[in-house]
Regions:
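Conserved nucleotide-cofactor-binding alpha/beta core module
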Residues: 52-171
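Class I SAM-dependent transferase core
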Residues: 1-72, 76, 89-105, 168-182
């Protein structure tokens, strides 16, 4: 119920390029550039639901893309750090945050594979877009009992995985399979 309420308070059309506004609510991944996508709304909802952000938590989202999921999470968490390296996507994210009156999301221009130790550790990390594996640097940025959500691509299947840090170990749990772009 909280996730639905968080979704309802953010207009997806404020977080897409102008040429995609009419398609902003379609249940398709929206192609933003030759190699970047905005995940479809129902997949973003599944991700946020499984991460289950709390009002006192700090969440890292990378790559932040247009900031849409970060905006939704901002209604559930204390702070969202949104890492993005594409200037055009950062501009869309910042305009969307301003238009929506969101002030607890910090958009940081940085390479996606760089760490954010200065802002962490984080209660949860969300990696948007399919990847081949989880780099250790991301797991090292989690607080104890922190959660990391990732879409792991193996051949032609993408599995949604949740990793939980417990002291010095990481436990993983398969959540669901989906179609997600890299």
């Amino acid at each position: 119920k909280e996730v639905i309420s968080a979704f309802s308070s953010v207009n997806r059309s404020d977080f897409v390029p102008e040429d995609l506004i009419l398609r902003s609510y379609t249940e398709k991944n929206l192609k933003l550039s030759s190699d970047r996508y905005l995940l479809r709304p129902n997949l973003i909802g599944e991700i946020i639901n499984h991460v289950s952000p709390k009002s006192n938590e700090s969440i890292l989202v990378l790559p932040a893309s247009t900031g849409y999921s970060s905006a939704i999470i901002s209604n559930l968490a204390e702070t969202v750090i949104a890492v993005e390296e594409d200037d055009n996507l950062i501009s869309i994210a910042e305009k969307g945050m301003n238009k929506s009156g969101i002030n607890n999301v910090v958009v940081i221009k940085k390479k996606i594979n760089e760490n954010c130790l200065d802002q962490g550790p984080f209660n949860a990390i969300i990696i948007e877009g399919a990847i081949d594996y989880i780099p250790d640097q991301f797991l090292n940025q989690l607080e104890n009992h922190g959660r990391l959500f990732a879409l792991i691509k193996k051949e032609d299947v993408t599995n949604a995985m949740l990793y939980i840090k417990n002291e010095n170990s990481i436990n993983s749990r398969f959540l669901f399979s989906c179609d997600a772009p890299k």
